[in-house]
Amino acid sequence: MSFPYFISPEQAMRERSELARKGIARGKSVVALAFAGGVLFVAENPSRSLQKISELYDRVGFAAAGKFNEFDNLRRGGIQFADTRGYAYDRRDVTGRQLANVYAQTLGTIFTEQAKPYEVELCVAEVAHYGESKAPELYRITYDGSIADEPHFVVMGGTTEPITTALKNTYTENADLPDALGIAVEALRAGSAENSSNDQPVLGVASLEAAILDANKPRRAFRRLTRSTLETLLQERDSKESAESEEPKESEEGKKTGKKSDADSSD
């Protein structure tokens, strides 16, 4: 007599979690961080048509890592939910926390009830309405419906440990856009260097997708950053850093010349 195959619920959840984590880890990394002017999204994405970063509503943005078809379905569902609620009630009734909760409930239901979980990790971010002085809100939603409120930055997909470590060492609150972009790009390069060989080129602007939620814009805060804009911002940061590094040298030279002149006057 053959017995039916049995698997405990705990083992089933472990296997689903492992499947989802492996699928997310195969994807490219995404970083979202708060800066002085709002929220910056930067994703490692060489494709020009398949986008990981999107607008959900007036002041709310979206970024994802994992399987594109799965998180794109979630993105479109979030846009439809936000549009319907904003039309039925008021545009200010659509918030990032509300959309993050909807995504958490959806992913939690899929994880427990469907045969296969979604291999995705999401970030929902919101900036304050124009004229309000409220800090940006960042929410991370994982494959099993878990939701977390992150105060400064979110790292998803790929190899997250070196990127998170780099951000912990370099992130500064209220940085301007060039500095924030430089911090995010350097962190992503740390993650790509962990996975690549020595002969592979450094992660460049051509392989990046970026956008911001601009808190200083009156209504729709979402704005994509073109690759030419990224190059300009990174060059601006490099020139500022080089200027700052030259200032201490000039002050030291001034002190040395001052000492020499004092010695000459005593003679």
UniProtKB/Swiss-Prot annotation:
Disulfide bonds: none annotated. Keywords: Cytoplasm, Proteasome. The formation of the proteasomal ATPase ARC-20S proteasome complex, likely via the docking of the C-termini of ARC into the intersubunit pockets in the alpha-rings, may trigger opening of the gate for substrate entry. Interconversion between the open-gate and close-gate conformations leads to a dynamic regulation of the 20S proteasome proteolysis activity. Pfam families: Proteasome (PF00227). The keyword Transmembrane does not apply. InterPro entries: Ntn_hydrolases_N, Proteasome_alpha, Proteasome_alpha-type, Proteasome_asu_bac, Proteasome_sua/b. Its main location: cytoplasm. GO terms for molecular function: threonine-type endopeptidase activity. It comes from the Bacteria. The keyword Cytoplasm applies. Pathway: Protein degradation; proteasomal Pup-dependent pathway. Residues 231-267 are annotated as: Disordered. It is found in: Cytoplasm. GO terms for biological process: modification-dependent protein catabolic process; proteasomal protein catabolic process. Residues 234-267 have a biased composition (Basic and acidic residues). One of its GO terms (cellular component) is cytoplasm. HAMAP family: Proteasome_A_B. Belongs to the peptidase T1A family. The 20S proteasome core is composed of 14 alpha and 14 beta subunits that assemble into four stacked heptameric rings, resulting in a barrel-shaped structure. The two inner rings, each composed of seven catalytic beta subunits, are sandwiched by two outer rings, each composed of seven alpha subunits. The catalytic chamber with the active sites is on the inside of the barrel. Has a gated structure, the ends of the cylinder being occluded by the N-termini of the alpha-subunits. Is capped by the proteasome-associated ATPase, ARC. Component of the proteasome core, a large protease complex with broad specificity involved in protein degradation. This is Proteasome subunit alpha. It comes from Mycobacterium marinum (strain ATCC BAA-535 / M).
